[in-house]
């Protein structure tokens, strides 16, 4: 390679300097090239992960709307009220009623929504009638009022009722006075006697009476009227069409002695049942009308004597379950009664396990020691 020495460049530089001085303008600085910029280092970028294809979303399953079955609150033929679940807004009232021969005829059971009939002792039965304030009509007289038994208290506990009675067996009184499941109203106690009256037309103890007004007053005094309980009451249906009805009746049943029967006969005019006592019409003392109900339930309940009881009292197993017969629409159906614990309400179930529905109107419940004591006729 050939090189140029500095002596040959000197004349050229001198000439350039003279030319700049003669121009009269400031010298423009020679632009200096910017230093080369290095390219940024490449940064490795992670490749995007392949996106997974979302699983297809299942179409929402339509939830069927449950069918609401109406629960009628009154008999369409007679207008008699029904103790229907969902309509109970006040505490029910239960009254123990005498069924000794000297107590005939009784008063006020024709106004009850539900009546229980069970053995007391020596073949004599006792009633427990349910009145529902705001549902059942007023009863100006109810009675004769008698004493309680343990199994009646167990039934009463399932209704959380104001429970009116006149004394009772030691076992029944002990539970009635100790449980918080009922409001106890004993006519033989000082705090209860003001709501009852003795009639001069009969001899004691078959002459003690009360009324729905007096019992409501007792409930008010105890601040025990409101009781909105969705579990109270029974399920009802409309009457079967006339073409589907029959005339089958629980014509006769007895508790101990066959010669002392009670029973019912089917009434096609009301699609209900008329009560018989020893084969003749059983009537209300005040109205003179034959006792009537829309539904009859006959349940089998095991019983046994209470050891050492000098009054011949018995115990009945009303906690648990057992067979029963239901009569309505002139037909007979096999059902099962269930009351799993003392505080639980008494319920009845069909063979398919569904809770039984009754015809709207009164219900009469009979507790027999054996269904063999029941005679059914058409």
Language model region names:
Residues 18-21:
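C-terminal motif of bacterial Sec signal peptides marking the signal peptidase cleavage site
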Residues 2-10:
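Bacterial N-terminal signal peptides that target proteins for export
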Residues 14, 24-80, 85:
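Ser/Thr-rich, Proline-interspersed low-complexity disordered segments
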Residues 9, 43, 56-57, 239, ...:
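Short linear sequence elements within intrinsically disordered, low-complexity coil regions
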Residues 71-116, 121-378:
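A surface/extracellular/periplasmic glyco- and lipid-processing/surface-interacting theme
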């Amino acid at each position: 390679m050939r090189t140029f020495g500095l002596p040959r460049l000197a004349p050229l530089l001198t000439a350039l300097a003279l030319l700049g001085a003669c121009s009269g303008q400031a010298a423009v600085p020679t632009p200096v090239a910017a230093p080369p910029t290095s390219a940024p280092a490449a940064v490795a970028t992670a490749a995007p992960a392949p996106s997974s294809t979302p699983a297809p979303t299942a179409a929402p399953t339509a939830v069927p709307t449950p069918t609401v079955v109406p629960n009628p609150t009154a008999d369409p033929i007679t207008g008699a009220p029904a103790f229907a679940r969902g309509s109970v807004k006040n505490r029910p009232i239960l009254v123990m009623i005498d069924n000794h021969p000297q107590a005939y005829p009784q008063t006020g059971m024709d106004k009850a929504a539900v009546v229980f009939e069970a053995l007391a002792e020596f073949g004599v039965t006792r009633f427990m009638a349910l009145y529902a304030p705001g549902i059942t009509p007023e009863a100006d007289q109810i009675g004769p009022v008698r004493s309680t038994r343990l199994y009646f208290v167990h039934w009463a506990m399932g209704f959380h009722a104001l429970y009116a009675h006149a004394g009772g067996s030691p076992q029944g009184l002990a539970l009635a006075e100790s449980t918080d499941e009922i409001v106890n109203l004993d006519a033989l106690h000082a705090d209860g006697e003001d709501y009852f009256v003795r009639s001069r037309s009969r001899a004691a103890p078959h002459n003690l009476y009360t009324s729905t007004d007096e019992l409501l007053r007792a409930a008010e005094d105890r601040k025990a009227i409101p009781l909105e309980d969705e579990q109270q009451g029974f399920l009802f249906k409309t009457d079967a069409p006339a073409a589907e009805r029959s005339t089958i009746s629980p014509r006769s049943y007895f508790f101990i002695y066959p010669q002392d029967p009670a029973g019912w006969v089917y009434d096609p005019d009301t699609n209900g049942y008329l009560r018989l006592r020893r084969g003749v019409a059983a009537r209300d003392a005040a109205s003179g009308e034959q006792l009537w109900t829309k539904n009859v339930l006959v349940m089998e309940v095991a019983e046994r004597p209470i050891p050492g009881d000098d009054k011949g009292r018995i115990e009945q197993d009303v906690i648990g379950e057992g067979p029963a017969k239901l009569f309505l629409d002139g037909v007979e159906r096999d059902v099962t009664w269930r009351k799993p614990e003392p505080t639980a309400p008494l319920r009845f179930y069909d063979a398919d396990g569904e809770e039984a529905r009754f015809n709207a109107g009164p219900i009469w419940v009979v507790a027999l020691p054996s269904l063999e004591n029941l005679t059914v006729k058409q």
